[in-house]
Amino acid sequence: MLRYLTAGESHGRGLSVIVEGLPAGVPLTDGDINTWLTRRQGGYGRGGRMAIERDQAEILAGVRGGLTLGSPIALFIANRDWENWQEIMAPGPEARAARVVTRPRPGHADLAGGLKYHQADLRNILERASARETAARVAAGAVAAVLLKELAIELAFHVVRIGPVEVREQVDWEAACRAVESPVYCADPEAGRAMVAAIEEARQQGDTLGGVVEVLARGVPAGLGSHVHWDRRLDGRLAQALMSIPAIKGVEIGAGFRVAALPGSRAHDAIAYRKGQGFYHPTNRAGGLEGGLTNGETLVLRAAMKPIPTLMHPLPSVDLVTKQPATASIERSDVCAVPAAAVVAAAAVAWVLAGAILEQFGGDYLPVIQERLAAYRQYLQEI
């Protein structure tokens, strides 16, 4: 079973990640992870925190000589901003009670978390609820992506909407791969420029913008997941992974919500067969998933991100101590983090797919898994 745990606060010493269940023999270096972390920090619209941090993952355990050992992998990402916060965020009793937060921000975990955990200082909630934690998720997803690459499964991501600006044409694989060259990870240059302008306008108004990201995965064989039980359906597992990303409020697979307006004759994908290729679908409205299983086509998933709720012109709130009306507190934040969310979403998809592969084919050593997957792919072509 592939799983990971993360620990760490936004302004703590750093973020820790434990990855368990990765087979032995997978080539893995710091650089494989740091490429993903750098992309997560990129994207037009990020705030001052990204000017401080230079995320670099350090592999502490589970890898020797550039190859995984099959034992748990330990990763650490230092927070450079810790220098400015160590007196406040120290784990010991010497921690100084400063920068106390008592005015919860609408749209954040502040109020609900404070009520659940009986915290008067909402910093004890927001530090962990912060999207800073997604750096650890991306590190785990990057490890999974390395395994997928060794199994000839590739990932791409791009931004399809920021605020009012939308990419209206379908983006092909090559264009999606080039999207990282855009300051907003948009595959359409004209739309990308309009997105930058929209972000700048929101910045000047003290506002924030959300958007929609798309993740593609190709080389995924048919049959991953299962129709047998609700919790084994791969579409459900992918949706849960995407919905768990902070600020994500909706997920689409394939044509998504658009199929609700179509008759069945136009909503589904016909089945075809070609000798040497096997069964395939000439169209891909299903987004590569049918009945809880992959169907052999490219996976297409979208996630909708709400605007960041930390505002320079805060919304009305109530002070937890005085119970009096107040404006919400302000924390350092971004104007738009949609490009970063695209990277986090791709990492989440990579993690779920890697787990599904290991469940399907088993094996504790990479060459064994490669051999089993190759035999299965041959079966799909020759059936």
From Swiss-Prot:
GO terms for biological process: amino acid biosynthetic process; aromatic amino acid family biosynthetic process; chorismate biosynthetic process. GO terms for molecular function: chorismate synthase activity; FMN binding. Belongs to the chorismate synthase family. PROSITE patterns: CHORISMATE_SYNTHASE_1, CHORISMATE_SYNTHASE_2. The keyword NADP applies. It catalyses: 5-O-(1-carboxyvinyl)-3-phosphoshikimate = chorismate + phosphate. This reaction introduces a second double bond into the aromatic ring system. Homotetramer. NADP(+) binds at R40, R46. Pathway: Metabolic intermediate biosynthesis; chorismate biosynthesis; chorismate from D-erythrose 4-phosphate and phosphoenolpyruvate: step 7/7. FMN binds at R128, A129, S130, G291, K306, P307, I308, P309, T310, R332. Reduced FMN (FMNH(2)). The lineage of its organism: Bacteria, Bacillati, Bacillota, Clostridia, Moorellales. InterPro entries: Chorismate_synth, Chorismate_synth_AroC_sf, Chorismate_synthase_CS. The keyword Amino-acid biosynthesis applies. One of its GO terms (cellular component) is cytosol. Keywords: Amino-acid biosynthesis, Aromatic amino acid biosynthesis, FAD, Flavoprotein, FMN, Lyase, NADP. Its EC number is 4.2.3.5. SUPFAM superfamilies: Chorismate synthase, AroC (SSF103263). Its cofactor is FMNH2. This is Chorismate synthase.
